[in-house]
């Protein structure tokens, strides 16, 4: 593979035997080692299996073959590789780099790998692991500033693609790889990284995870699909999870568990496994999801024997105007304190157990909202004539329902009341959850959708069409709830959701704020379920029963 061309204009004199297919090189009897090398370098699938020793699946090999062909023929094409989560996208790219380093080690030239944040370190670690082959072990070198991996005269240089990083000046002779494409800044990529390909019409490969329709990855997908429509050359490789599961039975089991846990249409499952953008599906609670939330059970006026109940409380601030019974509130637009009672039931196929904290159904118990307590502005710990303390009213309500556990939003004004309820009911029966902060609320929203999408959240039916009723208010808030994704667009980290503060609705009393207090109260049960699932909580059901006696002499 020695090159006779000048360093300024590299020429890939590797067409024979590398691109003629298997069995077209010298006879094994004339030069076994040369024949074996040419045989294994003729196809990245063979190289993966026999040199690296970690055979790639067909769904990984197929796009890599197209990329290798573009690199060797200097077609200058761009490719997009999107695989379901944890199905080997980065493994495939690491093996591609090792293959090209081995193929080009005498010819020379450079490849560039760009990523943001942790993606850069992951790419380097994976490459080092895959360079540990009989052909490359002890022969590759690592250099710094920027980090560079060299095998013979070929190299891969790793650069940060963050807009504030100093990454100019490098050349991608053969290949440019950009990882985490969903997080890339399009203007920065076009200004800094795309020109690196110019000198030798290098191939570009974009990797990433599906997030939003407006990010770099999805926009690039549209561009490349248009190019393919014009010339027929495939450029976009979106690997469906079914293709992965067909080749990897273990992945099929894993995928089934994710769908069972979150639901097929949960944004995490839809985006990361089924490659569907999360912002193209309506609001946070589109009609199909709202239908999942509607139960067939009525609202209850009191607890029933032998049923297990929990409570979720979204606590609002107090209003100074509440010092007198019937007096006008100083801030009538403030949120309400809402306590939602949930009944825990199990699927019909479940075996009854005394402790629902132990998984007795696939996915866990079903949470059915059966009642709600609402208060507007009452002082938490100060009574007034004809106006009891909110603390006492809440305690009476929780005791009347004999709740097995209570979760309360303890952020801000909630910590004091949470501590007071814990002292009154028992600390093992009260969870004070800090909902303040975007990360905690993002996770709560994601967990709530997992409950809904797996059929385990149900709100009572019967009054949803009666204006100003509790059920009506809940569904108005569900409809008004919006969402957005910030930062990297990770649904369980970057979700921003809630009813806009400016949202208003026309009621028989006039135009009123919509609020999101009933929705947030109900949502808190998802945090209760997360803790139950993780083993941090165990809900006990107790009942008095008369056990018939038995004659010991009979």
Language model features with spans:
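Short acidic-glycine loop/turn motifs at beta-strand connectors
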Residues: 151-153, 343-347, 453
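RNase H-like, metal-dependent nuclease domains and their acidic two-metal-ion catalytic environment used
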Residues: 94-95, 174-177, 205, 213, ...
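Acidic, glycine-rich loop-and-strand cores that form catalytic or ligand-binding grooves
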Residues: 452, 456-458
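Short, surface-exposed acidic/glycine-rich loop or hinge patches that mediate macromolecular interfaces
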Residues: 118, 183, 244, 384, ...
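Phosphate/NTP-binding elements of NTP-utilizing enzymes
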Residues: 2-313, 318-320, 405
């Amino acid at each position: 593979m020695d090159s006779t061309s000048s360093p300024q204009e590299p020429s890939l004199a590797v067409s024979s035997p590398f691109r003629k297919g298997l069995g077209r090189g010298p006879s094994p009897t004339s030069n076994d080692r040369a024949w074996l090398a040419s045989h294994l370098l003729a196809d990245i699938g063979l190289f993966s299996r026999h040199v690296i020793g970690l055979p790639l699946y067909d769904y990984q090999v197929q796009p890599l073959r197209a990329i290798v062909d573009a690199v060797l023929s200097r077609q200058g094409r761009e490719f997009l590789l999107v695989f379901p989560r944890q199905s080997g996208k980065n493994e495939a790219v690491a093996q591609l780099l090792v293959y090209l380093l081995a193929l080009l080690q005498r010819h020379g030239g450079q490849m560039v790998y760009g990523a943001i944040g942790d993606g850069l370190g992951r790419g380097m670690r994976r490459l080092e692991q895959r360079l540990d082959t009989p052909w490359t072990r002890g022969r590759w070198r690592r250099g710094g500033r920027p980090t560079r991996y060299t095998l013979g005269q070929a190299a891969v240089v790793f650069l940060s693609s963050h807009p504030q990083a100093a990454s100019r000046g490098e050349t991608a002779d053969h290949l440019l790889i950009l990882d985490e494409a969903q997080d890339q800044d399009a203007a920065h990529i076009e200004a800094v990284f795309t020109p690196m390909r110019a000198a030798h019409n290098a191939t570009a490969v974009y990797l990433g995870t599906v997030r939003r329709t407006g990010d770099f990855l999805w926009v690039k997908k549209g561009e490349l699909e248009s190019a393919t429509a014009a010339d027929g050359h495939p450029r976009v490789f979106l690997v469906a999870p079914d293709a992965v599961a067909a080749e990897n039975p273990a992945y099929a089991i894993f995928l089934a568990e994710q769908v069972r846990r979150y639901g097929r249409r949960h944004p995490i499952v839809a985006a990361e496994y089924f490659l569907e953008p999360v912002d193209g599906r309506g609001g946070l609670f589109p009609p199909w999801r709202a239908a999942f939330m509607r139960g067939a059970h009525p609202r209850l006026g009191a607890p029933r024997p032998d049923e297990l109940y929990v409570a979720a409380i979204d606590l609002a601030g107090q209003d100074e105007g509440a010092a007198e019974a019937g007096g006008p509130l100083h801030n009538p637009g403030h949120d309400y304190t809402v306590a939602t009672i949930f009944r825990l039931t199990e699927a019909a196929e479940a075996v009854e157990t005394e402790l629902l904290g132990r998984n007795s159904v696939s996915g866990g118990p079903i949470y059915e909202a059966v009642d709600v307590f609402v208060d507007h502005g009452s002082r938490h710990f100060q009574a007034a004539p004809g106006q009891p303390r909110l603390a006492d009213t809440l305690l009476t309500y929780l005791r009347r329902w004999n709740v097995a556990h209570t979760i309360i939003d303890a952020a801000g004004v909630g910590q004091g009341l949470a501590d007071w309820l814990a002292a009154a009911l028992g600390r093992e029966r009260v969870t004070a959850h800090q909902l303040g902060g975007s990360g905690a609320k993002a996770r709560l929203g994601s967990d709530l959708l997992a409950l809904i999408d797996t059929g385990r959240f149900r709100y009572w039916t019967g009054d949803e069409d009666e204006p100003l009723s509790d059920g009506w208010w809940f569904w108005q808030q569900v409809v008004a709830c919006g969402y957005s994704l910030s930062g990297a667009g990770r649904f369980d980290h970057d979700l921003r959701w809630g009813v806009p503060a400016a949202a208003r609705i026309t009621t028989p009393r006039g135009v009123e704020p919509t609020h999101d207090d009933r929705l947030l109260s109900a949502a808190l049960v998802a945090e209760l379920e997360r803790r139950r699932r993780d083993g941090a909580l165990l809900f006990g059901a107790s009942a008095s029963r008369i056990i018939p006696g038995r004659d010991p002499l009979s």
